[in-house]
Amino acid sequence: MTSKEKNGDYTLQVCDSLWLNRSFREEIRKKIAEAPLKDKSYRYSDVGFILLQMLAEELSGKPMDEYLWQEFYQPMGLEHTAYLPLRYFDKKEVVPSAVDRFLRKTTLQGFVHDESAAFQGGISGNAGLFSNAREVGRIYQMLLNGGELDGRRYLSKETCALFT
């Protein structure tokens, strides 16, 4: 399922020297969808946010990163908020985020630290978004304003109440 270089079916980059088979993302999503629901116990899981991403992509007809860029980040004037930042910025502009001694065995710079997000190609409902303090501040200001920023409504007040 992995390769040390990009070739053929290995197109999802997990770090500088690790590529994942492109079928892995869909296989994982299929397993999530088919997993039986158990009740009466709590266990932390990213699955809900991954399912939320799948729902958003289905409803919008767009990949999540594209939808968020068009509907939120670009209109909000966010120029440094993106998934897969190495597509847009030089590596020296991206702060290293973690040292992965377990799986990828490298310092992660421009790659999501969360393994489940990394193995979905770096774009996931649970992790993978990179930004800077100023732009995170603008997103939170929009939430504090009940979904509005600079005179434009992005989210309903009810959605903001649920988020916060």
Describe every region a protein language model picked out.
Residues 1-164:
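Short, surface-exposed loop or secondary-structure junction motifs
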